[in-house]
């Protein structure tokens, strides 16, 4: 390598917040099913602790060798509803606690996969899992949960949309922060390394390593060098920068998989912000030319950013997957928080932005008295964008008891701080209460 390249890499880490956001081990639990929930839970704990016992140590060793921070070490597992069978909501708690205990035993930050896939309908295990969520997410510390309620092939399960609005409200009654551990998807992917939506799909190998990279600060610094240039130069600069960022993820992921003796899965190309200044997707958009994120032109700038990240990253990794785009979580992005507080960034604008990026209405605080049907309607709107446009969309909404619009809610750590945002005061109840199933779009019929 040339001296300039070495210096550039050092600066990306030390000054521009480049990190490996997560090394996530995906583990299949399909072979853990036993005669009783208690036996299955015991098998779940044993398999996770067997395969993941060295995950944290290996990640830390790679950090020391290469000087590249690995912010999170995580686990994803088979959607638990798929192995639940005839379990009751109370039975599901054995599985939730087994996941939590295993995650703590091996020292990871989070474990994802307390999940259900209900885009076409409910099986018993799906309903049992969803009904158990208020207890499961408040009685555990590290368990992350997701529910897929729609897909471009199946349409949208409006009964599930309604149930998830009610479930989110029920969780709020027990905890103001537990909903940060739950995401509702359309077109969920099977190899996502990011939380809270990670689960290990049934088409995956038994155990794999997936990596999520992050570098909004690196992209921002690169764009500072092309101020005033035509927009195609901006796109080209982002592509080249994304290539460099992704090569780091490819190297770390392949090395971690080799040392752990498991398969290497994918690199997720997502630009994932943190609450730290200089590590913000909003600041990247503003560097492209917006006075503040949320103003007119934001959606176009985000489309360019998202597309250029994918184009640059695809060439840098042998396998790209996950969500791969730009994340716009309000509470986890200092620039987004500023824009909401200034009254520039609204829920309506955020919804528009989700049509061109990963992944959806994410980490958004709303007043605690927001109706369950209103939350369901927000989920339905996001699902519609994903289903119609054949992309992943999601909602991670945080109703917070005792808050009003403008209050700040602190979720701690990487989850950050969110200003409470207003929702439209008119009701969507009659629409949501219809229930049933929104058919798949006409372009879903491809055979």
UniProtKB/Swiss-Prot annotation:
Name listed for the protein in its UniProt record: UPF0210 protein LCK_00974
Complex and partners: Homodimer.
NCBIfam families assigned: PRK05313.1
Gene3D superfamilies in the record: 3.20.70.20
Assigned protein family: Belongs to the UPF0210 family.
Pfam families according to UniProt: DUF711
Domain of life of the native organism: Bacteria
């Amino acid at each position: 390598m040339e001296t300039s390249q070495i210096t550039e890499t050092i600066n990306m880490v030390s000054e521009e917040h480049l990190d490996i956001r997560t090394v996530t081990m995906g583990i299949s639990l399909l072979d853990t099913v036993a005669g009783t929930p208690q036996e299955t839970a015991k098998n779940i704990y044993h398999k996770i602790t067997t395969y993941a016992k060295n995950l944290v140590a290996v990640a830390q060793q790679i950090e020391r060798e290469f000087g590249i921070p690995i912010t999170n070490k995580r686990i994803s597992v088979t959607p638990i509803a798929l192995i639940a069978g005839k379990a009751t909501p109370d039975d599901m708690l054995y599985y939730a606690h087994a996941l939590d205990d295993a995650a703590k035993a091996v020292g990871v930050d989070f474990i994802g996969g307390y999940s259900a896939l209900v885009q076409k309908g409910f099986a018993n295990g799906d309903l049992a899992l969803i009904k158990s969520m208020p207890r499961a997410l408040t009685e555990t510390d590290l368990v992350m949960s997701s529910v897929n309620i729609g897909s471009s092939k199946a349409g949208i399960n409006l009964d599930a949309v309604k149930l998830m609005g009610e479930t989110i409200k029920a969780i709020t009654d027990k905890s103001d922060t537990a909903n940060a551990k739950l995401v509702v998807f359309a077109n969920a992917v099977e190899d996502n390394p990011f939380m809270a939506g990670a689960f290990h799909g049934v088409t995956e190998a038994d155990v794999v390593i997936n990596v999520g990279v992050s570098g909004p600060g690196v992209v921002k610094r690169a764009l500072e060098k092309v101020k005033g240039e035509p927009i195609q130069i901006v796109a080209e600069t982002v592509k080249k920068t994304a290539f460099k960022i992704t090569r780091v993820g490819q190297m770390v992921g392949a090395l971690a998989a080799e040392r752990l003796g498991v398969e290497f899965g994918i690199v997720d190309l997502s630009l994932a912000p943190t609450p730290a200044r200089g590590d913000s997707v909003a600041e990247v958009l503003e560097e492209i030319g917006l006075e503040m994120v949320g103003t007119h032109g934001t959606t176009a700038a985000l489309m360019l950013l998202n597309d250029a990240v994918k184009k640059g990253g695809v060439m840098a990794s042998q396998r790209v997957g996950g969500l791969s785009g730009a994340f716009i979580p309000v509470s986890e992005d200092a620039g987004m928080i500023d824009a909401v507080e200034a009254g520039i960034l609204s829920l309506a604008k955020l919804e528009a932005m989700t049509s061109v990026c990963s992944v959806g209405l994410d980490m958004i605080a709303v007043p605690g008295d927001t109706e369950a049907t209103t939350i369901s309607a927000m989920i339905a709107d996001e699902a519609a964008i994903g289903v119609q446009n054949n992309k992943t969309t999601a909602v991670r909404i945080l109703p917070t008891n005792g808050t009003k619009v403008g209050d700040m809610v602190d979720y701690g750590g990487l989850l950050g701080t969110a200003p409470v945002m207003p929702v439209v005061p008119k009701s969507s109840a009659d629409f949501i209460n219809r229930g049933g199933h929104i058919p798949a779009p006409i372009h879903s019929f491809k055979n």
